[in-house]
Amino acid sequence: CKEISLDLGGREILKDISLQVASGEVLGVIGPNGAGKTSLFEVLCGRFPAKSGTVTFKGQDVSALPLYQRARIGIGRTYQTPVVPDELTVAEVFKAARQAYKPYLNRWHVLWAMRLVRFSADPDMPAVQLDTLDRRKLLLSCLIMRRPPLLLMDEPAAGLINSEVDDFDDLIRVLAKELNVAIIIVEHRIELLDTIADRVMVMDAGEKISEGDLGMVLKDPRVRAAYFEDVH
């Protein structure tokens, strides 16, 4: 995206944000609460229209496309809370995901995605009974089976214990390096980004204040003032 600005309720949420991420690259996004990280994702996925600026995907301007069309062309998104339908089983969630795209995906796509993310569960189990890690893997499988070139991941480690974070860490590396997926990840756990992020962008008050490798940005006085003083 280039020079993205966003106003909500008369308040400026994003101010001239520009970023790019290449296939196979992981870009981490950090910043204090209220920095605009999730709002940036809302613009990129098409939920919020930007006040100004452009969103480009695979060389084409997609700024005017709504959320569902951006999803169909390959912009995938995960959320902080892995919400699954209360009334559907694991198998029914996969069926709904398969039929959301034309041509319909088949059972082979489901099995391939499940193996990739190391997800296994009784297909007749109500999806709502899955633990947090398996809910995340179920929803990620539903995205991955259509091979999106870009994934927006909003705090994928939220609610996970340390061993589960390590598992998800490995999974993100597989998606980026073996499937060549471009990944933008909002995450508060610096130790996770230290192992998976190729670059890190830091936001504060709706603006990008620093970008580069993690070690470099953590030494930036603006980052220490805006991010770490807020955290501590």
Outline where the language-model segments fall.
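The feature captures the beta-strand-to-loop junction immediately N-terminal to the Walker
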Residues: 30-32
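Helix-to-loop junction immediately C-terminal to a conserved catalytic motif
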Residues: 45
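Conserved ABC transporter NBD signature motif
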Residues: 53-60, 73
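Catalytic Walker B motif of ABC-type/P-loop ATPase nucleotide-binding domains
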Residues: 151-155
